[in-house]
Amino acid sequence: MQVRTRAAGTGEWTDWQDVETHYTQHGADPDSSEAATGKARGATAPLWVGESDGVEVRVLPQAGDPEDVDPVDTGSDEGASGGEGAGEGGEVSTLPAGMRLDLVDPGEAVPGESAEGAEEPRTGVMTAAAQAASAANSALVPLGATHIPSLTAEETRKELVTLRGTELTEQQQAKPYIGPRPSIVTRRGWGADESLREKSFVYTSKVKAAFVHHTASGNNYSCSQAPSLIRGFYRYHTKSLGWRDIGYNFLVDKCGRIYEGRAGGVAKPVKGAHTMGFNSKTTGIAVIGSYGSKKPSSKAVKAVARLTAWKLGLHGMNPKKKTSLTSAGGNLYAKGTKVKMKVISGHRDGFNTSCPGGKLYKKLSSVRSKAAEYQGR
């Protein structure tokens, strides 16, 4: 499947761009309440195109030459509803029924939005849903905060006792291995419309592993546009795909800025929809961009290491070790299969996919080493 767009103002068309298919592999576990709503549907990965006033899509039902296939005429914003095309040898192949093109407007920039993320203070009345999302971080920052500031190693260790004192093991109490808390832009900071998500928060018992992803949305964005991309992902996940909230627990842009993803509190074990089969007892971190052939920035890689050092440290997990997870069902491990997984893994380790892209996947070894170093191991 390929897409090209026409830039607003210049009228110039982009080259044809491939979009990642089978995007629901990032979704909820098969038997979860989120998957059972009946709202979820198959989709491609979202593609960031910036300000555009025209779009064309072409779809190959099976392997063939894209130059021999006419673009699918979407007809309207709702897109086409499928059809037939000629495959190899002149055979007719049917396109999926109900195909449509969703155009996602990320909305206007939030006040103070810049390359450094949204800055305080934020004005305006908070809705009940916005208050609930913000209150989930009340142990870390005041209600309505747009960012959670970083802490020193000592401050983080003291906070760990405050957050999880009675749950800490004797070893954690004696010598807690946890990385300094990094700065995180909150949902209010990137301008989340809290009316789009389900009202309640869903938690898992603890966080034993982190799965690293890429959004496969392209790399043609500036860091000042990152909040817009995240608002787009959020709307796409909830309105187009029928998920309860954005799927990822955290997102990281190319400048190394970390953003809160799914609502429920950054220090809490929020259950995401990022690695089908392994959303329980894990957290999902998505680096914004496509990293199959392009290397991720050093700032982004460092941010993933800092984030995992802190988040995994809250639960006493060693980034350089392995842990046991039980599959809830997927295309790589059958439901109920116990799997030894690296504490910091790529999406492809839990599901048969190219995510997080070969170039980012190769960086995970250094992420593990740096995260362990940040934890003081």
Task: List PLM regions with ranges.
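Beta-sandwich interaction modules
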Residues: T5-D73
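Short acidic-glycine loop/turn motifs at beta-strand connectors
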Residues: A8-G9, D253-C255
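Basic/polar, cationic surfaces and motifs that engage anionic cell-wall
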Residues: G79-T215, N219, K254-P269, A273, ...
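Short, conserved charged micro-motifs
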Residues: Y221-C223
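Short Gly/aromatic-enriched secondary-structure transition segments
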Residues: Q225-F233
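Carboxylate/His-rich catalytic cores and anion/metal-binding grooves
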Residues: R244-I246
